[in-house]
């Protein structure tokens, strides 16, 4: 069982994928104590399988990040920014709201995310008791053979736990990781392209 998000002492989220031609992704609500899957739902991850003879290569993109307050499970997909909000209070995945990109998995498969020269990447997710924070970075790339990924700007998108968009904060630094500390009420950010040279602290 591949646990990707621990919700509380009894619940966790895991992911699974099929590679049999259907090539689908699933999120699962799991009872930690027994390992039993309580409920599952299709995800919007893109699973690509390439077979050459007896060899098989697998590429999984647009995977979600997770945050939960114990009652709601929020997902944000890395390349599309789609936000899904599930009510998990009854031990099931009850979708209560989706925000943003509405493309189907089949439509997303037509997008070559690796060849995007410029766009937005929803790279990090954190939360407080009052809101969910998504770090969105604007990026550009230079093509091979001298491939380079550069972060151009960073902003913080906030939502309440019901899925209602709140404020957008434009950060004065380019960062690609964020973590909210509930004890201090501060947001700690850094850019690993700079090899952890600086940590930037924001008050919200």
Which residue stretches match the model-derived regions?
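Short consensus segments that form the blades of beta-propeller domains
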Residues: 17-20, 54-55, 73-76, 113-115, ...
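Blade-level signature of beta-propeller repeat domains, shared across WD40, Kelch, NHL, RCC1
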Residues: 179-204
């Amino acid at each position: 069982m591949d646990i990707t998000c621990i919700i509380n002492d009894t619940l966790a989220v895991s992911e699974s994928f099929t590679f049999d031609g259907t090539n689908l992704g699933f999120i699962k609500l799991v009872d930690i104590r027994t390992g039993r899957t309580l409920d599952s739902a299709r995800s919007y991850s893109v699973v690509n399988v390439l077979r050459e003879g007896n060899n098989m290569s697998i590429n999984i993109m647009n995977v979600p990040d997770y945050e939960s307050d114990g009652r709601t499970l929020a997902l944000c997909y890395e390349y599309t920014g789609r936000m899904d909000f599930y009510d998990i209070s009854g031990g099931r995945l009850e979708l209560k709201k989706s925000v943003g990109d509405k493309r189907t998995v089949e439509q997303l498969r037509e997008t070559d995310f690796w060849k995007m020269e410029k766009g937005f990447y929803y790279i990090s997710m954190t939360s407080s008791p009052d809101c969910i924070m998504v770090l969105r970075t604007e990026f550009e790339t230079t093509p091979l053979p001298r491939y380079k990924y550069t972060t151009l700007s960073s902003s913080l998108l906030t939502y309440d736990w019901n899925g209602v968009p709140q404020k957008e904060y434009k950060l004065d630094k380019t960062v690609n990781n964020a973590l909210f500390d509930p004890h201090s009420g501060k947001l700690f950010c850094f850019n690993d392209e700079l090899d952890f040279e600086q940590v930037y602290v924001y008050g919200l």
